């Protein structure tokens, strides 16, 4: 996050970036440990592997003058400084807004754009409707609005729900100051939700970036955060501790996970290609059918 407004003119976060560091100031580089599994869930996971890594304890032992590289989203890296983070990531008063902070309003942070072309990644309509049903259990008069980078896709996926794409500071503060949040598997919402002073409930997709296809693995394990509730494909909610315990059991007992750490070749790779192609065909075929139905419905009106 660069903390800029929509026109990249002025930082909206009152964020001290530290003293300027020059290349010669770094005497070593530490790359956070990676872990990937290779599956036919999508072309990316077959070719490059799906990133599933959790925390790397080595991050806590780097020396001064080290350039730290990695995903670096694990809760353990920043949770001890949560209250300080709220100060470090404080929004300047002139950019802050509580216009959409209401006791009966839930904000959906929907990620579209390039996500929408990946069936393993783009969250299905069922995730959002199941999550909204959970929020309705809290208040029967709960209303919903969408904050998104892709208003067109939001209208197609969830017609009838108001959708907005504000300048980046507007999207950020709307998420940060919401009472109730349903977020996507995008890191954009993580820090505003994690540092929020107003939020009462956050629902996120179980298995994060592989909510649609996972048989128990997380993409990645770094995205399990205390205080978030994770919605499974079964429509049920799981707290962070339950997710961690389930993951530990999965890692210890699941043969699929143990056998997919190496990129496949030969027949195994070709079978993966067939699986991925079938997933894309079904996904885009379904989108085409739904688009045709919308057009026909519009003509009938």
Regions found by a protein language model. Give the residues of each.
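Secretory-pathway luminal glycosyltransferase catalytic domains
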Residues: 7-139, 240-296
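Hydrophobic beta-strand segments of well-ordered beta-sheets in folded domains
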Residues: 1, 66, 104-106, 142-144, ...
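Short, solvent-exposed loop/turn segments at secondary-structure junctions
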Residues: 3-7, 73-74, 111-115, 128, ...
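Catalytic binding pocket for nucleotide-activated donors in carbohydrate/polymer assembly enzymes
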Residues: 189, 194-264, 268
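Donor-binding and catalytic core of enzymes assembling or modifying cell-surface/extracellular glycoconjugates
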Residues: 125, 134-222
């Amino acid at each position: 996050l660069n903390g800029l407004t929509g026109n990249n003119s002025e930082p909206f976060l009152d964020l001290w970036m530290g003293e300027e560091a020059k290349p010669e100031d770094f005497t070593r580089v530490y790359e956070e440990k990676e872990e990937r599994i290779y599956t036919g869930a999508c072309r990316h996971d077959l070719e490059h592997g799906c990133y599933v890594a959790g925390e790397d304890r080595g991050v806590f032992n780097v020396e001064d003058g080290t350039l730290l590289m990695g995903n670096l989203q694990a809760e353990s890296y920043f949770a001890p400084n949560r209250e300080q983070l709220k100060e470090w990531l404080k929004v300047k008063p002139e950019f802050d807004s509580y216009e959409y902070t209401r006791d009966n309003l839930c904000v959906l942070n929907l990620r579209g754009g390039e996500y929408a072309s990946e069936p393993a990644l783009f969250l299905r309509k069922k995730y959002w409707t199941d999550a909204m049903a959970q929020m309705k259990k809290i208040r029967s008069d709960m209303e919903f609005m969408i904050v998104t980078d892709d208003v067109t896709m939001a209208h197609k996926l969830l017609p009838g729900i108001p959708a907005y794409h504000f300048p980046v500071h507007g999207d950020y503060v709307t998420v940060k100051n919401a009472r109730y949040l349903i977020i996507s598997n995008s890191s954009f919402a993580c820090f505003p939700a994690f540092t929020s002073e107003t939020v009462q409930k956050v629902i996120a997709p179980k298995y994060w970036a592989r909510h649609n296809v996972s048989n128990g693995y997380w993409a990645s394990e770094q995205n399990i955060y205390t205080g978030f509730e994770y919605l499974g494909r079964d429509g049920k909610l799981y707290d962070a501790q339950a997710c961690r315990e389930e993951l530990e059991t999965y890692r210890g007992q699941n043969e699929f996970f143990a056998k997919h750490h190496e990129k496949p070749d030969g027949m195994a790779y070709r079978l993966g290609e067939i699986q991925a192609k079938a997933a894309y065909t079904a996904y885009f075929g379904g989108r085409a059918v739904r688009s045709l139905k919308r057009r026909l419905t519009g003509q009938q009106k």
